[in-house]
């Protein structure tokens, strides 16, 4: 079949007892037995990824990280989007070549030098998992804060405590975890419905911002819209030079746009995965980036007073809601916030869904303690319920950061952006360096643009890794409460897992493991169709896994 995998160079045939299609044949060639039902279409996995992207709630949640850093200008979104799209396109090409739920770590295991493959795979797994495991709690936290902000807006005497925020966030997490355990067909339908709502609500709130804009009536002496110079100008709110602050503001864009990897991790749940998964990645990043940019323009031309949003005079705790109060009547503020809350819930549910499938895939490869428990799939629903439970427990522990204050809990946003970027780009870095002449692209590929786009994405990530660790203040103003704790939390985790690998895990961790039973593998047997294209349906009792040329030494 010409696929590089953990079964490459072994000249084997796999016995099967049922008719299989091209997707299952490719997965067997990669080294995994089909355990999950393929009931997701291109639209379904795009639905999940677009819901994980969650533009409306993401933009609302990231006001602190963009508008309150360099002002209302949409320029940071535009510039960052160009480079983020290059990262996504490079990932799409990787997903087409290795369409399995293990995602980027599996690709790293096949593209890295053999001597370092196990460690680089280990590093990528933990990096990607730290991105995935912080997604759902950060979105659930944002959703809870918006709900409580809406309560404060309607009842000014109400001020939410940390315990109330934690309790409400936990309630959202419980509901999302419960729904992630449903059968795949139900989850697919719910995800599709969630995407429809997210798109509709995004359009509705966009129209409400422009059509319901009454800022000239709410505040005297200003026009209905800002001038071009005001809307596009930079207003440095940080203590760094404007250029550095501009780069720091990319964090909001990176976090808001970080859901495009979901189709990769759902590849084992969709049909025609080698084409559908990369297409969904491209659609998510491109469509999401353009729509988000339009939304940024709407905000730039209507925002009234950044200082008021930063000061939060009504103690709402949500800059986006404070922004809405500057331009809308009370009823419209309530309506727009309510729609954002609903979208945020759909986003949280899909984040937990995608992350649980990542946990399942990594447990299958033995990454975690007690992996034998976490990798089990429910025979009734054919979903990884134990992985959902594990994620829920870890995410609840992360949410205890709520009691440390806004900056502490805010670290899960920046960790997600940093870790995601690193894990997304690792296979691209290997593809354009060590495996430059040996990488065999899948049916969806970038052709002659593969290497240039790959270098652009790697260079951008290399620039942004240290930038994402910068606080917005410096000098005497840099106190523990204002510190950016991303570097400590993320690199602390990586340090601990690296020590674990060197001391113990290197003895047994070899990267992705096949879950195909030895009884079903025949070594040294060649078949006539070895190396042929994968057929749509295979009507036999044997599947030949080509003894592909030894491409990764």
From Swiss-Prot:
Transmembrane segments: 43-63, 68-88, 133-153, 163-183, 190-210, 240-260, 280-300, 333-353, 397-417, 453-473, 485-505
Membrane topology: Multi-pass membrane protein
Keywords: Membrane, Transmembrane, Transmembrane helix, Transport
Gene Ontology terms for molecular function: transmembrane transporter activity
Pfam families reported for this sequence: AA_permease_2 (PF13520)
Subcellular localization(s) per the UniProt record: Membrane
InterPro entries: AA/rel_permease1 (IPR002293)
One cellular component term from this protein's GO annotations in UniProt: membrane
Family statement drawn from the similarity comment of this UniProt entry: Belongs to the amino acid-polyamine-organocation (APC) superfamily.
Record-given protein name: Putative polyamine transporter
Taxonomic lineage from the root: Eukaryota, Fungi, Dikarya, Ascomycota, Saccharomycotina
């Amino acid at each position: 079949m010409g696929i590089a995998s953990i079964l490459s160079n072994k000249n084997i045939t796999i016995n099967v007892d049922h008719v299989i299609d091209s997707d299952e044949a490719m997965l067997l060639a990669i080294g995994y037995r089909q355990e999950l039902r393929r009931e997701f279409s291109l639209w379904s996995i795009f639905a999940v990824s677009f819901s994980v992207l969650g533009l409306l709630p993401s933009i609302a949640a990231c006001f602190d990280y963009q508008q309150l850093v360099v002002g209302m200008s949409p320029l940071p979104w535009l510039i960052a989007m160009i480079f983020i799209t290059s990262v996504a396109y490079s990932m799409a090409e990787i997903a087409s070549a290795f369409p399995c739920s293990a995602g980027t770590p599996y690709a790293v295991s096949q593209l890295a030098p053999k001597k370092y493959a196990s460690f680089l795979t280990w590093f990528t797994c933990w990096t990607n998992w730290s991105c995935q495991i912080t997604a759902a709690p950060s979105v659930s936290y944002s959703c809870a804060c918006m709900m409580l902000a809406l309560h404060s807006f309607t009842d000014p005497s109400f001020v939410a405590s940390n315990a109330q925020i934690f309790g409400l966030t936990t309630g959202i997490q419980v509901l999302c975890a419960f729904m992630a355990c449903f059968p795949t067909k139900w989850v697919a339908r719910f995800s599709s419905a969630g995407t429809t709502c997210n798109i509709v609500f995004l359009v509705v709130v966009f129209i409400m911002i422009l059509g319901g804009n009454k800022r000239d009536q709410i505040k005297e002496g200003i026009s209905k819209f800002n001038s071009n110079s005001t809307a596009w100008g930079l207003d440095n709110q940080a203590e760094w030079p404007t250029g550095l602050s501009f780069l720091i503001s990319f964090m909001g864009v990176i976090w808001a746009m970080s859901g495009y990897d979901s189709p990769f991790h759902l590849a084992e749940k969709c049909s025609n995965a080698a084409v559908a998964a990369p297409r969904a990645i491209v659609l998510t990043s491109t469509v999401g980036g353009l729509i988000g940019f339009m939304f940024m323009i709407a905000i730039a031309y209507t925002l009234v007073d950044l200082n008021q949003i930063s000061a939060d005079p009504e103690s709402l705790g949500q800059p986006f809601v404070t922004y809405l109060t500057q331009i809308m009547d009370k009823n419209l503020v309530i309506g727009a916030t309510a729609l954002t809350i609903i979208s945020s819930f759909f986003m949280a549910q899909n984040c937990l869904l995608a992350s649980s499938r990542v946990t399942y895939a990594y447990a299958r490869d033995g990454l975690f303690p007690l992996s034998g428990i976490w990798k089990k799939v429910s025979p009734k629903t054919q979903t990884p319920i134990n992985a959902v439970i594990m994620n829920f427990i870890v995410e609840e522990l992360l949410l205890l950061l709520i009691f440390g204050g806004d900056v502490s809990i805010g670290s899960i946003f920046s960790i997600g952006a940093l870790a995601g970027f690193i894990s997304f780009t690792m296979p691209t870095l290997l593809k354009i360096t060590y495996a430059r002449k040996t990488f065999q692209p899948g049916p969806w590929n970038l052709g002659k643009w593969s290497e240039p786009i790959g270098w652009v994405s790697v260079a951008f990530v290399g620039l942004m890794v240290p930038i994402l660790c910068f606080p917005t203040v410096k000098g005497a103003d840099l106190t523990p409460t204002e510190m950016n704790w991303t570097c400590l939390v993320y690199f602390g985790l990586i340090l601990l897992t690296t020590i674990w690998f060197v001391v113990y895990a290197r003895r047994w961790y070899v990267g992705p493991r096949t879950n195909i039973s030895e009884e079903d593998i025949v070594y040294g047997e060649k078949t006539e169709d070895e190396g042929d294209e994968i057929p749509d349906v295979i009507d036999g009792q044997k599947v030949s896994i080509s003894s592909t040329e030894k491409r990764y030494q």
